Amino acid sequence: MSHLQAHMQRNNKESHSLSPFSQDSQHVTLPVECLEHGQGLELPHYATSGSAGLDLRAALAEEETVVLAPGQRALIPTGLVFHLLPGFEAQIRPRSGLALKHGITCLNTPGTIDSDYRGEIKILLINLGQENFSIQRGMRIAQTVIAPVVQVNVCAIEPDQKDSSQTPSNEGSRGADGFGSTGHD
């Protein structure tokens, strides 16, 4: 039995024997394909019962180290392919400890993994700190939050169209003000 099969079997028992693509009111199962260079790494899991994000790990070769100099960015493989259910996305977010202690964060945050994407999840990291930062195999480099997606129907309206029976009011309490218009305190 592969690492992935064992994890899915354990996960299914913990999720009341849900099939890999099922959901109930409490759980959505995320089938994860583990690529060859990701074999042996821990699958994403929640660190605590209240965690929103699943930790993602660097799937570098055993002897490989990626050194990010200040200001440098790199695309780090995770060795994982997510098989998301339609109606969900995976948001890629930085880990707060890496950001605070080392200035390491994700670019394009939150990054969106669409439900129909079937390529490897890779993390675009940047070093905003003052010192070099080394990334090695198995290091927790980011987190992913699985979230529902609402797709909308887009319709064009005329600037003076105010028929509230067809479209929401365009008279917002802020008007067109933005970028700090509500204050700085």
From Swiss-Prot:
The UniProt record lists the keyword Magnesium: yes
Gene Ontology biological-process entries: dUMP biosynthetic process; dUTP catabolic process
Database matches in Gene3D superfamilies: 2.70.40.10
Top-level lineage group: Bacteria
Transmembrane segments: none
Pathway: Pyrimidine metabolism; dUMP biosynthesis; dUMP from dCTP (dUTP route): step 2/2
Binding sites annotated in the UniProt record for substrate: 95-97, 108, 112-114, 122
A Pfam match: dUTPase
Cofactor(s) required, per the database record: Mg(2+)
CDD domains assigned: trimeric_dUTPase
Free-text function comment from the UniProt entry: This enzyme is involved in nucleotide metabolism: it produces dUMP, the immediate precursor of thymidine nucleotides and it decreases the intracellular concentration of dUTP so that uracil cannot be incorporated into DNA.
PANTHER family hit by this protein: DEOXYURIDINE 5'-TRIPHOSPHATE NUCLEOTIDOHYDROLASE
Protein name: Deoxyuridine 5'-triphosphate nucleotidohydrolase
Biological source species: Bartonella quintana (strain Toulouse)
